[in-house]
């Protein structure tokens, strides 16, 4: 299959049968040492003796220790050449890591054969010594919520990190920069990896995922051609003698450094409309003398999923038209026809496609061998340790400034690569692309702008939450700690609900995209890889319901009922076998199509499957993937899913009624009423709602359990769904406050006590250390739901207290806080540890659905801004000591400047709304009209 390394022996000479014996002995030795490879022996004998040779080969195998692994992974495969097509013979030779033949050479001679050594360029001879200079302290900058390492600019649009030589952040503090075409993750050290379209299937450079070393497969070097001294304009890999400044912004990152009289400013960003990444280096010579410098760009090529699986297939060349370095991987699963290119804006350059030449034997990017030579060799081609490296030389007069542009990307073919190079590789094209980035994010993030007495809320809500949701979750589908690339059915549906105010068309697109991943039976792919759609079919019990839920929420907010009539294909694939939890496959598009409305109907009907307590079946997990063994046998039931299904039925009943589908509307209403009754009858534990029942009927989330006595989401959704008995719902949330809110650690646990030593076997959640991630840590997604529930109950004090706990700025605004929290204080983290000695430490960041839900909590639940078709509703839950706050809202091309005047203590209700001086109503509704004017609205609370 190619999953394991292949050693190929081609033999046609019966007299060289000793080669077969030696290779079999070697293969047995490798297996004994744990080195698993496929040994392929091809019988090249086309004479009348080919059967004799075949028998002798098989006889040697059967007489030795390899007999039991013929045609098995890691075993021996014997094939006659005459049975193989020419394409297969070429393929075997191409993918084999080692090729032996029955030539005149012995096996030892073939093993010891060496390629002719390439002549490398001459070593660089310095003409002067580097001047001694004291390290200049970094200039002080105005920053808010500064923790000693980083803080926000006063407008909150950049997070500025300052690092003195040898200093580092407690964990990588990154920026996830993405567009629909390309993305890159850049850390404060300068480490980066880049992908095109799918961060898992088509990585251009290596994803290291090593937060300790923060390794990188991309870097830029500056070299003084007179002294030979070199450094990187980023803190890694070749740290200079003075400090660095890193500025993470919306769609870009900037690195500032000053060394040897040369100040540098490196901008990195991606094009919004093309698969092109930019690294623009601005240099200023303030040394008082003319300077000769070189700049070198380096990229460790992957062109697929993993470097080790693709490096031998990558072929590089110098493009004769542009001088750019091209790379191809004809065996790449998602990139076989693509051309990857690296280019520099200067005409004079040298290149290499050989990583071994660049780094050197036992070398490292901190001290690459290539920077000890005058230039790069120009060597490209096949069979190399592949990379893309470009070096250019420049001269700087006294006080002169220069801008050098490195572009890196992928094209469908060479002609498109030429177009991208011509369009983007010069300073003008790069500048235009950067201005487009600035313009896009300023426009998108400016759709809702709030001014409140809480400056941390302002900073987070006015940019970072939507930026995290759109750049990392929807477009990038990647972060530093996870390079997923796939769409999660439930994941991006939840994310796009947060985009209703800023980019509602993206929410609409996601509804259609997800409906296309639904099978005829109503279930869906749990996740899938674009563009081809390979993914997993599972028994997860909540995925498909998110389609109906998100559709209802989208229509309620936008009034766009036309989306329900969009015609969408189903998928066709085999159904899961009994006892089968999931399978990975590439399902085909069905000939059957239906409206989005019908897709939602099938999803809801598929969810109407109940267990012994007449509650919905858990399957191999509901929202909590880690509880995959609770209902694996098809009998376990989920209480949280019951609340979620109830909410779906209530919402969709109204939608069905508005479409004239009275039959389904009545079915939804009847099922919702019965489900609510069943929950109250069976799921109430005395002080809170249970979480689930195992297949054998054992309750989970009950006071009878030794572990996981209480789980927060069964309580919070009793409120969010409006389905719980009001008195019980309040009692359940009081239990959450008492048992799961850890004020000493400023976190909100998902469940408690964590799974550890009891007989309960809920699934892989128990494999997490107690107090980590879902197993009793703060799982931020669920913690936001708990906060939302308190707000919906009108408990303003509790809701704002928990919001402050959730706000990452509050975890990293002082040195002692960031030392404990460690991760980025400007974006949401998926989880926070709740176990000593790591209590309060952040888990993985960026790639988490917590960002979208946090935005909805901030804007919709707490500040009370909800869009309802062509109206805005103001229904806030704000602290009693607030006098007023403002929301600037853009509706298409029209701005509404809304001031909410709080009437003092217990100002919970809207008493009057005026627009442009005229009273509109007292119900908290603001009519929306796209007249391209600016409207001033005042909302009075009392």
Language-model features and meaning:
Residues 298, 525-526, 644-765, 804, ...:
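Catalytic cores of carbohydrate-active enzymes
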Residues 449-463, 509, 514-515, 519, ...:
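Active-site acid/base region of carbohydrate-active enzymes
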Residues 481-485, 490, 525-542, 570-591, ...:
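Carbohydrate-binding/catalytic loop surfaces
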Residues 914-918:
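Short strand-turn-strand beta-turns centered on an Asx-Gly dipeptide
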């Amino acid at each position: 299959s190619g999953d394991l390394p292949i050693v190929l022996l081609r033999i046609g000479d019966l007299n060289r049968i000793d080669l077969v014996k030696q290779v079999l002995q070697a293969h047995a030795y490798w297996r004994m040492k744990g080195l698993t490879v496929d040994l392929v022996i091809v019988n090249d004998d086309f004479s009348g003796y080919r059967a004799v040779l075949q028998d002798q080969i098989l006889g040697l195998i059967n007489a030795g220790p390899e007999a039991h692994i013929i045609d098995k992974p890691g075993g021996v495969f014997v094939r006659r050449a005459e049975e193989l097509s020419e394409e297969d013979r070429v393929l075997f030779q191409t993918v084999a890591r080692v090729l032996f033949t029955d030539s005149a050479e012995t096996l030892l001679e073939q093993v010891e054969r060496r390629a002719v050594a390439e002549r490398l360029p001459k070593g660089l001879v310095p003409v002067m010594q580097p001047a001694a200079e004291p390290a200049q302290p970094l200039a002080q900058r105005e920053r808010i919520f500064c923790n000693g390492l980083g803080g926000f600019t006063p407008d909150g649009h950049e997070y500025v990190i300052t690092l003195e030589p040898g200093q580092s952040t407690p964990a990588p503090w990154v920026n996830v920069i993405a567009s629909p075409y390309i993305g890159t993750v850049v850390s404060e050290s300068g480490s980066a990896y880049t992908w095109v379209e799918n961060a898992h299937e088509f990585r251009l450079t290596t994803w290291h995922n090593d937060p300790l070393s923060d390794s990188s497969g991309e870097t830029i070097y500056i070299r003084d051609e007179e002294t030979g001294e070199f450094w990187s304009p980023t803190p890694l890999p070749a740290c200079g003698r003075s400090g660095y400044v890193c500025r993470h912004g919306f769609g870009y990152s900037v690195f500032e450094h000053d060394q040897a009289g040369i100040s540098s400013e490196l901008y990195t960003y991606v094009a919004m409309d093309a698969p092109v990444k930019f690294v623009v280096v601005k240099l200023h010579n303030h040394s008082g003398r003319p300077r000769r410098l070189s700049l070198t760009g380096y990229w460790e090529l992957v062109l697929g999923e993993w470097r080790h699986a693709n490096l031998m297939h990558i072929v590089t060349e110098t493009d004769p038209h542009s001088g750019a370095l091209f790379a191809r991987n004809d065996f790449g699963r998602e990139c076989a026809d693509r051309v990857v290119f690296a280019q520099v804006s200067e005409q004079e350059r040298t290149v290499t496609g050989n990583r071994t030449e660049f780094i050197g034997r036992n070398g490292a990017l901190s001290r690459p061998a290539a920077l000890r030579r005058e230039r790069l060799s120009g060597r490209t081609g096949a069979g190399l340790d592949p990379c893309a490296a470009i070096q250019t030389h420049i001269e700087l007069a006294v006080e002169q400034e220069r801008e050098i542009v490195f572009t890196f990307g992928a094209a469908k073919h060479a002609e498109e690569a030429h177009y991208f190079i011509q369009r983007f590789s010069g300073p003008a094209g790069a500048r235009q692309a950067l201005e487009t980035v600035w313009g896009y994010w300023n426009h998108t993030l400016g759709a809702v702008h709030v001014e409140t007495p809480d400056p941390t809320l302002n900073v987070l809500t006015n940019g970072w939450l939507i930026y995290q949701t759109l750049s990392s979750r929807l477009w990038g589908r990647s972060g530093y700690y996870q390079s997923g690339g796939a769409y999660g059915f439930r994941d991006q549906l939840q994310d796009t609900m947060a985009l209703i105010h800023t980019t509602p068309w993206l929410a609409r697109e996601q509804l259609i995209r997800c409906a296309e991943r639904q099978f005829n039976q109503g279930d869906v792919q749990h996740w899938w890889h674009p563009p081809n759609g390979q993914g997993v079919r599972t028994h997860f019990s909540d995925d498909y319901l998110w389609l109906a839920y998100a559709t209802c929420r989208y229509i309620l907010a936008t009034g766009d009922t036309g989306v329900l009539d969009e015609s969408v294909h189903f998928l066709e694939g085999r159904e899961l076998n009994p006892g089968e939890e999931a399978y990975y496959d590439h399902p085909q598009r069905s000939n059957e199509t239906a409206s989005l409305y019908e897709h939602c109907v099938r999803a809801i009907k598929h969810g109407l499957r109940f267990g012994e307590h007449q509650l919905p079946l858990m399957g191999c997990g509901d929202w909590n993937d880690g509880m995959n063994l609770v209902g694996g046998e098809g009998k376990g039931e989920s209480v949280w899913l019951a609340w979620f299904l109830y909410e779906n039925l209530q919402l969709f009943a109204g939608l069905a009624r508005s479409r004239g589908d009275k039959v389904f509307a009545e079915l939804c209403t009847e099922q919702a009423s019965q489900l609510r009754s069943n929950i109250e009858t069976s799921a109430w534990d005395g002080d809170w709602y249970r979480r689930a029942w195992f297949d054998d009927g054992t309750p989970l989330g009950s006071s009878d359990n030794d572990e996981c006595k209480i789980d927060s989401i069964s309580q919070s959704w009793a409120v969010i769904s409006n389905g719980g008995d009001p008195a019980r719902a309040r009692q359940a949330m009081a239990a959450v406050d008492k048992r799961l809110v850890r004020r000493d650690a400023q976190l909100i646990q998902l469940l408690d006590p964590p799974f550890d030593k009891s007989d309960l076997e809920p699934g892989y959640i128990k494999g997490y250390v107690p107090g980590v991630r879902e197993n009793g840590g703060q799982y931020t997604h669920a913690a936001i739901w708990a906060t939302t529930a308190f707000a919906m109950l009108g408990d303003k004090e509790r809701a704002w207290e928990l919001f402050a706990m959730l706000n990452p700025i509050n975890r990293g605004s002082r040195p002692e806080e960031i030392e404990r929290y460690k991760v980025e204080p400007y974006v949401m983290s998926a989880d926070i540890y709740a176990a000593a000695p790591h209590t309060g430490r952040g888990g993985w960041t960026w790639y988490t659905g917590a960002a979208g839900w946090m935005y909805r909590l901030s804007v919709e639940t707490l500040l009370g801004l909800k869009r309802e078709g062509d109206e805005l509703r103001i229904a806030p839950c704000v602290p009693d000591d607030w006098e007023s706050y403002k929301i600037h809202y853009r509706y298409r091309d029209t701005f509404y400047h809304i001031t909410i005047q709080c009437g003092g203590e217990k100002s919970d209700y809207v008493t009057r709304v005026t627009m442009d001086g005229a009273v509109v109503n007292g119900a908290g509704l603001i009519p929306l009209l796209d007249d391209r004017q600016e409207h001033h609205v005042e909302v009075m609370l009392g």
